[in-house]
Design a protein with these regions (language model features):
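Active-site beta-loop-alpha junctions enriched in small/polar residues
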Residues: 11-13, 83, 115-119, 141-145, ...
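Divalent metal-coordination and catalytic microenvironments
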Residues: 11, 69, 78, 112, ...
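Catalytic pocket-lining loop regions of alpha/beta-barrel enzymes
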Residues: 23, 136-137, 151-266, 273, ...
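A short acidic (Asp/Glu
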Residues: 18-20, 90-92, 125, 186-187, ...
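Mid-to-C-terminal alpha-helical segments outside catalytic/metal-binding sites
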Residues: 1-68, 77, 128, 258-263, ...
Length: 353
C-alpha cells in the first residue's frame, strides 16, 4: 500500500538463469543483457539498488523475492510472468510450474501467468494443463526460438485456437512482451503491430502490452486508440523515470493522450530492478508544464492510483478495498509495518507509505 492506495506490480519474474540451468551461450547472453539493463538504468549514485550478479541476480531466491516485494517494498500483490525459453535453459528461464510453487508461499498476493509456445504440437493441451496449475493469464513471447524457428506472430492463425481456448476456460488476460530485444533475440520479432488483428478479432480478451511497445511507441498508441481492450504496461518504460525523466514524461504523455488513465498499468520488471525506487519515483513524478500543455494531459493523484493498482485489479476482478482488508495483519503486512515504522522517509526507494 502506498499513500493508502492499493499497489499491484503487473510485471515481475521468478527466474533461474544459474550456470547449472543455462544450456548454452544464449542462456548466458540473455541474463547478461538483463543485468546490463539493471546496471544501466539504476538511479545514479545510489549503490543500494545494485544487485550482485552471481549471488542475487542470476537465480531468484523465493524468500528474497517476497521480502523485497512485500516487506521492503510497498506492493500488495504482484504478477509472476513467464518466459520459458527452452532452447536456452534446461528447465526454462521461468515456467508455470515454478510459478505455481512460488504462489503457494503467498497465495493471496501472487498471480501466475502461463507461457505457451503456439508452435508446440501440444499447445492446446498446455493451455488446459497450465490453467489447472492455477495460472490466471498467459504471457506470450513472440521472439522465442524453437529449433530453426526464430519467432512467431500474434496474428498468425495458428495462435487463434489458443486464444479461443482461453476464452472457453474463462482466461481473459493476454500479456505480450512488445518491447526491447534481449540478446540473442531479434527486435523485429517483438514488433507490436501484430497485436492489432487479434485485439479486434477477440474483444473478450484483454491484450496487456508489456513495455508499451517501446521503441515502437507510436505504432502502439495508434493501434491502441481504436482497440479499447489493449493496455499499456509500464515495465521498462518506468525504469527511465529517475535518470531520464523527460523521456519518461513523453512516454506517459503519449499514453495518457491516446489511451487515457484507465488503460495504463504499473509494472517494474523486478528483479531486473528493485521495485521500490520505481514506485517512489512514479508517485513523486509530475509532467513538465510544457509537455502538459502540448498534450493536454495531467498525471494526477487519481490517475496514479489507477496506474499503480486500480487498473490491473479491475482486469483480474480484484476488489481493492476487500483485498487490502484481507491482507491486513498477515505475516508480510506485519513485517512491512515494522519496516515502515523504523525507516525514515528518503528520496528514491524510501518505502514510506
Amino acid at each position: 500500500m502506498k499513500n493508502g492506495k492499493f499497489v499491484m506490480d503487473a510485471h515481475t519474474g521468478f527466474w533461474d538463469a544459474s550456470a547449472e540451468n543455462c544450456k548454452n551461450k544464449y542462456g548466458e547472453a540473455f541474463v547478461e543483457t538483463f543485468y546490463a539493463f539493471h546496471t544501466g538504468f539504476n538511479p545514479g549514485g545510489q549503490a543500494q539498488w545494485t544487485m550482485d550478479y552471481e549471488k542475487t541476480f542470476r537465480k531468484v531466491d523465493p524468500d528474497w523475492y517476497l521480502e523485497t516485494m512485500f516487506v521492503q517494498g510497498d506492493a500488495d500483490m504482484a504478477i509472476l510472468s513467464t518466459q520459458v525459453l527452452m532452447d536456452f535453459y534446461h528447465t526454462g528461464f521461468t515456467n508455470p510450474e515454478r510459478n505455481a510453487e512460488m504462489i503457494k508461499r503467498a497465495p493471496d498476493r501472487l498471480i501466475g501467468l502461463g507461457g505457451i509456445d503456439p508452435r508446440a504440437p501440444d499447445a492446446l493441451e498446455q493451455v488446459d494443463r497450465q490453467v489447472e496449475l492455477g495460472m490466471k493469464g498467459f504471457k506470450w513471447y513472440t521472439a522465442e526460438w524453437r529449433g530453426e524457428s526464430r519467432g512467431w506472430k500474434a496474428n498468425d492463425p495458428m495462435v487463434f485456437p489458443l486464444y479461443e481456448r482461453c476464452i472457453e476456460l474463462g482466461i481473459k488476460n493476454m500479456h505480450f512482451h512488445k518491447g526491447p530485444a534481449v540478446e540473442p533475440l531479434a527486435l523485429e520479432r517483438f514488433d507490436v503491430r501484430d497485436i492489432d488483428e487479434p485485439s479486434t478479432l477477440y474483444p473478450e480478451l484483454n491484450f496487456i502490452v508489456d513495455h508499451c511497445g517501446l521503441p515502437r511507441l507510436d505504432d502502439f498508441c495508434w493501434l491502441s486508440a481504436r482497440s479499447p481492450n489493449v493496455y499499456a504496461s509500464l515495465a521498462v518504460a518506468l525504469a527511465f523515470v529517475h535518470n531520464r525523466p523527460r523521456f519518461f514524461a513523453n512516454v506517459m504523455a503519449n499514453l495518457l493522450f491516446w489511451l487515457g488513465p484507465d488503460r495504463i498499468i504499473y509494472g517494474t520488471d523486478f528483479p531486473i530492478w528493485y521495485p521500490q525506487w520505481q514506485l517512489d519515483d512514479l508517485m513523486a513524478f509530475q509532467l513538465p508544464a510544457d509537455i502538459e500543455d502540448e498534450f493536454g494531459v495531467s498525471l494526477t493523484d487519481e490517475t496514479k492510483e489507477k496506474i499503480i493498482g486500480g487498473n490491473i485489479a479491475r482486469l483480474y476482478d480484484i476488489d481493492t478495498a476487500a483485498k487490502l482488508a484481507q491482507l491486513k495483519g498477515d505475516a508480510l503486512d506485519v513485517r512491512r509495518d515494522e519496516r515502515v515504522a523504523s525507516t525514515p522517509s528518503q528520496t528514491a526507494g524510501a518505502g514510506a507509505r
